[in-house]
């Protein structure tokens, strides 16, 4: 998700647009760009976010692709085969359903906000070390975690680097100014729960 959680949606959209960074559509991007019918604090956040963005910025979100594929890997925000239904890969059975439609040996996903590593044929989530080899003879599913809204108990930003020359995936955690992100949410008078969870990584 580019937007829909924090107090700096304009800056996030502009950073990606101005630098030509390829990006997939997340469920929060879709709700902001296409409208939503939810209630509660998520509606407050999404409605506020929509009001901050220009027509061009919302159009950019609306036009983001659902999937991305290169010869070396494919990527999708949620679960295959229907990413627009925003299914979560949380268990080995979820991963098995996803693998049935994964066309590349390696696929990157997000959506759960927690780093994870699934290997086809294994009945449980693969334990992550900081660097994992990529085996092109069997399918692997890699959740990249979250930069701005981690949910695995570690508040630091999480992302991965796929090193083609080494054929491995490197999970990285980096510190960022969590208080500044919290203040942006508070200054916008958005629900405090969005700010409080940043320091907990939950």
Language model region names:
Residues 1, 5, 22-27, 76, ...:
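Active-site neighborhood of phospho(di)ester-bond hydrolases with catalytic His/Asp-centered motifs
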Residues 121-202:
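Acidic, His/Gly-rich catalytic cores of divalent-metal-dependent hydrolytic chemistry
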Residues 4-6, 28-33, 81-83, 108-120, ...:
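Active-site environment of divalent metal-dependent phosphoester hydrolases
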Residues 10-11, 36-37, 87, 119-122, ...:
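Short amphipathic alpha-helical segments
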Residues 1-62:
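Core catalytic region of metal-dependent phosphoesterases/phosphodiesterases
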Residues 52-119:
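His/acidic metal-ligating clusters that form di-metal
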């Amino acid at each position: 998700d580019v937007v829909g959680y924090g107090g700096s949606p304009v800056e996030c959209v502009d950073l990606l647009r101005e630098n030509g960074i390829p990006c997939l559509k997340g469920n929060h991007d879709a709700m902001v760009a296409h409208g939503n019918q939810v209630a509660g604090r998520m509606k407050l956040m999404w409605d506020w976010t929509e009001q901050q963005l220009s027509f061009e910025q919302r159009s950019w979100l609306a036009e983001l692709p659902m999937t991305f594929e290169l010869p070396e890997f494919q990527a999708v925000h949620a679960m295959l085969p229907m990413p627009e239904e925003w299914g979560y890969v949380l268990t080995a059975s979820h991963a098995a359903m996803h693998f049935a439609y994964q066309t590349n040996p390696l696929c990157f996903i997000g959506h759960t906000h927690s780093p994870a590593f699934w290997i086809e044929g294994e009945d449980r989530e693969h334990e992550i070390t900081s660097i994992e080899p990529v085996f092109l003879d069997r399918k692997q599913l890699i959740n990249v975690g979250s930069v701005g809204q981690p949910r695995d108990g570690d508040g630091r930003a999480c992302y991965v680097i796929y090193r083609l020359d080494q054929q491995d995936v490197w999970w990285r955690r980096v510190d960022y100014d969590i208080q500044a992100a919290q203040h942006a949410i508070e200054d916008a008078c958005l629900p405090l729960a969005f700010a409080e969870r940043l320091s907990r990584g939950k």
